[in-house]
Amino acid sequence: MMKRTTIAGGAIATALVLLALAVGYRARRQDVEPAAAKPPAVTPPAEKEEEAHQSFLYGRIDTIDGVGYEGRLRWGGDEEAFWGNYFNGARKDNPWAAYVPPERLPKESHPIEIFGIEIANPERPANLGRLFMARFGDLARIESHGRDVQVTLKSGAVFDLDRFSASDFDDGVRVWTGSRGVVDLDSLRISAIEFLPPPRLGAAPGRLQGTVRTRQGDFTGFIQWDREECVGSDELDGHTAGGKLSLRFDTIHSIARRSLDSSHDSSLVTLLDGREIVLSGTREVGQGNRGVYVDDPRFGRVLVSWNACERVVFSPGGSGPAYGDFPPGGPLTGRVTTRAGRRLAGRLVYDLDESEVTETLDAPSQGVNYTIPFGLVASIVLPGPEERGAQRARVTLHSGEEVQLECAGDLGAGNAGMLIFIDGRQRPEYVPWADVEQVDLDRPPAMYPPLGGRKITGAR
């Protein structure tokens, strides 16, 4: 009996010592790292099934070892997921430069200064390297060829990209297969990607949609927060007084930017049940935020910078465009009017770069970057020399919508000029950008977003 009592007493003492050690360890751990805040219990709304699934990327990926994977796709594992999202890269070279006489190729100056005094201003040929950007819905196939990536559009146009220069290809792809589960494929294993209309898919997350409010107006459409998060199961990360907190986007009603100054940037998050939470301390909810993409059907896509964004209000997401909603593009055609009064009509190459209606006009306005497919654009009217103070171009769309864009990006002085392939002539006409007064573009037979509104005749 004494032995049992002694053993029992020893066991109790040992347990008390272990309990004290555990409490002490927990207290020290809390001093070093605050416990994560418990996410509020909010039930996400029910997701619509089949209709929304047609907007997800889908295709077949062949690997270098001969294995094929078919299923729903998401770039980089947690980035681009829909046909309206963009694939980005850098062109290997510029084939259009060969059509311009060497002495007429654009030049740029690089002033040399010593102690603030300019001692020379040498000119050198301008950099004609160009980036590539196309919606996944406009793509037919992507192939890997060593250091090159070859992209084929639905129209049949082929573009060679430099694999190691800012290419989305190297982000890898996540595939939801039927038989192998979820597979993450490194780009080094990928030989080719063929895009296909999706069949009936299993469970898939809902898409983010809503309205982004800015000082210059509202933009409504499908949303990518911080250029990445685009489905309801993605999470918004931040810190509260209680520690780190992650919120699923499908539990959020709105996000409002709160900025006292650059060092005290935060976001006010309102949940679907009305509760409000202030998040700070991460890139996603502060100055490090890279902006909000909005697929606004009026313009194609806009990127609202963090400083321009005032509030995002989410709304139930409908079905986005399916693969078949993106018709094959075609050559860019229209007329160029020079400042000297010449009018040149034919197939166009804009900025010694864009030659297809599915390629985009990229220019900013008050913290919002517009990415407008050329097939939506009816005319571009540039400010005259007497309007230098304004420095805004008037862009009219085939829908009748008009937007004033800053003379920067594709509308800026760095534009390399235009080629006009006139019927019956062996070589195209080249017009430097400084000589361009107006560009009128022909209306394509079909586009996405669909062409609405009246037909614009290009009246001056």
Where do the model's predicted regions map?
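N-terminal alpha-helical "arm" segments
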Residues: 15-17
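N-terminal Sec-pathway targeting helices
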Residues: 2-13
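Compositionally biased alpha-helical segments
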Residues: 9, 19-460
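Initiator methionine at the very start of the polypeptide chain
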Residues: 1-2, 460
